[in-house]
Amino acid sequence: MSMKWTSALLLIQLSCYLSFGSCGKVLVWPTEFSHWMNIKTILDELVQRGHEVTVLAYSTSILPDPNNPSPLKFEICPTSLTETEFQDSVTQLVKRWSDIRKDTFWPHFLHVQEMMWTYGDMIRKFCKDVVSNKKLMKKLQESRFDVVLADAISPCGELLAELLKIPFVYSLRFSPGYALEKHGGGFLFPPSYVPVTMSELRDQMTFMERVQNMIYMVYFDFWFQVWDVKNWDQFYSKVLGRPTTLFEIMAKAEIWLIRNYWDFQFPHPLLPNVEFVGGLHCKPAKPLPKEMEEFVQSSGDNGVVVFSLGSMVSNMSEERANVIASALAKIPQKVLWRFDGNKPDTLGLNTQLYKWLPQNDLLGHPKTRAFITHGGANGIYEAIYHGIPMVGVPLFADQPDNIAHMKAKGAAVRLDFDTMSSTDLLNALKTVINDPIYKENAMKLSSIHHDQPVKPLDRAVFWIEFVMRHKGAKHLRVAAHDLTWFQYHSLDVIGFLLACVATVIFIITKCLFCVWKFVRTRKKGKRD
């Protein structure tokens, strides 16, 4: 570790002593790629505030790289899977998801479930390697952590918290069909006005759209499983030595930090232990590298367009690249395109290719006019933060849903990556750049995002510290977690009331019958 980081850690430790033991110890169960980027923002802030943060990473981790200088501590757990094998597996999953036809409901989500199970099997293997490593678990026990911070999309963090007997906090963007949020967190999503995730619907639904949304909800609630829950339940029961389920352990989460906010999400009810922290990674733009700044300034009053399909897409076909390049060549703006491939034949003089872009800094530049994006939540939040209208070209996962949200809010135009023509892309760019309503709507979302009493990052850190200070947040946990499914839906109460009504009706009917019989008998006696 460099002298710089050593000095920083010494200062942090000194601040802990001076603050009378207010510093805590945080154990982190991370997830790869953009999930890690978000959670690392929280971890860096926790370290800045004097807390000791330990990241539990498996030896094949891609982004949580313990070899990079960092104030974070890393505990590495060996696993039989190599980094190359893991990265190839993830790349194949992304490619398969991108290739699934989205216009066929059942096959689409059956493939999604299959891929989620494949990913879940890898995570379960990593989890087994951790909890079966007696030396590592003993070290974690002796470290006396105050809280576990985990991404709910990768199970195991809650199991570690249960084994270590400490509270845990979740960070989560979403799960397909809100499955984890509903079954593990008890969240409420009325289907009459809350569209199911990945449905690409908006909150203002027609009757037939509400029918469609109800079908989605029933499918995700009773058929679709994010993970192979049966195997996870058996695994957790075996490790803990008692019958339990994955969702039963997930329900013990003290706080859910959802990476969303009302500038992005449609309004819906929230539980007391749920906090929105969307855009926590966003920050003011920094100066661009000299050569890039010169290129941006050369655009004059026309400005620039920023184009990025994210870090997980690097296999664009030559045909698609040429379709895109020819459209970009026809606009008056200069274009900065993140592209890792052979230079397209139709590339215009106004377009520069880069293997990496300082995306946030470009979106915050005063000359940026539009953002062509795949619809990743991180990129969309940076565009919202800086008030930049978007052309959405979603590829997989939550991206189509994200772009549907931005389109509903009037800040984006959507295109289909596989079928769009050069003319389609050109017209979409002209629309979001020349029609002022898109810029106005983007700025409105930006204003909403900035007008919060507490910044998202500060809110996330506050609640983690709150859980450490109070050894949990049980006072925010709804009693619904302690009810059976029929108690939750008051079916036992409804059954009891129906039985009471039926009993009263039966008694009244019997009484009336007896009175009728008595009267009839008396009349017959008088005749005799």
From Swiss-Prot:
Positions of transmembrane segments: 493-513
Keywords annotated in UniProt: Endoplasmic reticulum, Glycoprotein, Glycosyltransferase, Membrane, Microsome, Signal, Transferase, Transmembrane, Transmembrane helix
Places the protein is found: Microsome membrane; Endoplasmic reticulum membrane
Catalytic activity: glucuronate acceptor + UDP-alpha-D-glucuronate = acceptor beta-D-glucuronoside + UDP + H(+)
Gene Ontology cellular-component terms listed: endoplasmic reticulum membrane
Main location: membrane
UniProt membrane topology term: Single-pass membrane protein
Known tissue expression: Expressed in liver, ovary, prostate, colon, kidney, pancreas, brain, cerebellum, mammary gland and epididymis. Not expressed in small intestine, spleen, bladder, adrenal gland and testis.
Name of this protein: UDP-glucuronosyltransferase 2B19
Gene: UGT2B19
